[in-house]
Curated annotation (Swiss-Prot):
GO terms for molecular function: chorismate mutase activity; prephenate dehydratase activity. Residues 1-96 form the Chorismate mutase domain. The record marks T265 as: Essential for prephenate dehydratase activity. Coiled coil: none annotated. Pfam families: ACT, CM_2, PDT. It is found in: Cytoplasm. The lineage of its organism: Bacteria, Pseudomonadati, Pseudomonadota, Gammaproteobacteria, Pseudomonadales. InterPro entries: ACT-like_dom_sf, ACT_dom, Chor_mutase/pphenate_deHydtase, Chorismate_II_sf, CM_dom_sf, CM_II_prokaryot, G/b/e-P-prot_chorismate_mutase, Preph_deHydtase. It comes from Pseudomonas aeruginosa (strain ATCC 15692 / DSM 22644 / CIP 104116 / JCM 14847 / LMG 12228 / 1C / PRS 101 / PAO1). This is Bifunctional chorismate mutase/prephenate dehydratase. Gene3D superfamilies: 3.30.70.260, Chorismate mutase (1.20.59.10), Periplasmic binding protein-like II (3.40.190.10).
Length: 365
């Protein structure tokens, strides 16, 4: 009886806390509406209000994580506040975000992780279409994959940066877990075909060699497409993630079958607005150099001499001429910082061409 009384008292306390939480969240939402009104009223002629500020969101999430004393871990607390901010921002202006579709892809999961579930997300059939939607102003932002820890760079994304003038506004890192999914009618002891995206098949190669060595592996346009195909076939399975399993009502025959447990993909947020410095930023650039001995060394010397950390470097052949190569470089810092400005100026003196793709806050989640 005493235990029941204690449970009742604790539940009453939770109910009271929930009421207070609701009151505070509602107050925050009303404050967001006030922010929208102030921004709109202070605009100059011909100016459009900027409601989503990546640097502000990054600061809020980091601040909350610094204040957190548990028992929820920092990432869980940050996710809760991300959703609160997403819902409040939707009251100011619902964000439209394009991503590499269809529904159920890891790119959609990355978009929702970064922007929260209150955004209007639109699937695109190809990476280049995401760039075009953003360039045309049909959406506010786009989300595209740029590199995987197992398979390396996503060349379609790198090539799209050569063709479009886009600004990188943020990054998202997503831990990738692959599952072998089956439908209600699948005869699991007679699977003869496994569908997935080519990169996912590659990321699960060893597991497939061990468990399904003689089964046909079919590369399709996306993991979500693989999941859709399984719904109508009794002898096939798909490799995809949690979102696709839930969306297409599939069961997990085997979970987490990726060869590397640290398998992750990095995604970029592209838009049309520059992001101010936060003090904890990355910058991405494209540099075109002549194909001559020592070209890469010349490019890297200014970074080394000024103690600037490079986080990624990729090489692609230039489309403008067979004697030119293009380097995609990510490094720590913001292009508005004096030291970074000096380094970029030195690089520009040696390069055929230099383009700053954007400076943006490091991934918080």
């Amino acid at each position: 009886m005493a235990d029941q009384d204690q449970l009742k008292a604790l539940r009453l306390r939770i109910d009271s806390l929930d009421e207070k939480l609701l009151e505070l969240i509602s107050e925050r939402a009303r404050c967001a509406q006030d922010v929208a009104r102030v921004k709109t009223q202070t605009l100059g002629e011909g100016e459009a209000p900027v409601f989503y500020r990546p640097e502000r969101e990054a600061w809020v999430l980091k601040h909350i994580m610094q204040l957190n004393k548990g028992p929820l871990d920092n990432e869980e607390v940050a996710r809760l506040f991300r959703e609160i901010m997403s819902s409040c921002l939707a009251l100011e202006q619902p964000l439209k975000v394009a991503y590499l579709g269809p529904e159920g892809t890891f790119t959609q999961a990355a978009a929702l992780k970064h922007f929260g579930n209150a955004v209007i997300s639109t699937p695109m059939a190809a990476i280049d279409e995401v760039f075009r939607e953003v360039a045309a102003g049909a959406v506010n932002f786009g989300v595209v994959p740029v590199e995987n820890s197992t398979e390396g760079a996503v060349n379609h994304t790198l090539d799209s940066f050569l063709e479009h003038d886009m600004v990188i506004c943020g990054e998202v890192e997503l831990r990738i877990h692959h599952h072998l999914l089956v439908g209600e009618t699948t005869k699991t002891d007679n699977i003869t075909r496994i569908y997935s995206h080519a990169q996912s098949l590659a990321q699960c190669r060893k597991w497939l060699d061990s468990h399904y060595p003689s089964v046909e592996r079919v590369a399709v346009s996306s993991n979500a497409d693989a999941a859709k195909r399984v719904k109508s076939e009794w002898n096939s399975a798909a490799i995809a993630g949690d979102m696709a399993a839930s969306l297409y009502d599939l069961s997990k025959l085997h979970e987490k079958i990726e060869d590397r447990p640290d398998n992750s993909t990095r995604f970029l947020i592209i838009g049309n607005q520059e992001v101010p410095p936060t003090g904890d930023d990355k910058t991405s650039i494209i540099v075109s150099m002549r194909n001559k001995p020592g070209a890469l060394h010349e490019l890297l010397v200014p970074f080394h001499n000024n103690g600037i950390d490079l986080t990624r470097i990729e090489t692609r052949p230039s489309r403008s001429g067979k004697w030119t190569y293009v380097f995609f470089i990510d490094f720590v810092g913001h292009h508005k910082e004096p030291l970074i400005k000096d380094v970029l100026e030195k690089i520009g003196q040696e390069a055929v061409a230099l383009k700053v793709l954007g400076s943006y806050p490091k991934a918080v989640l």
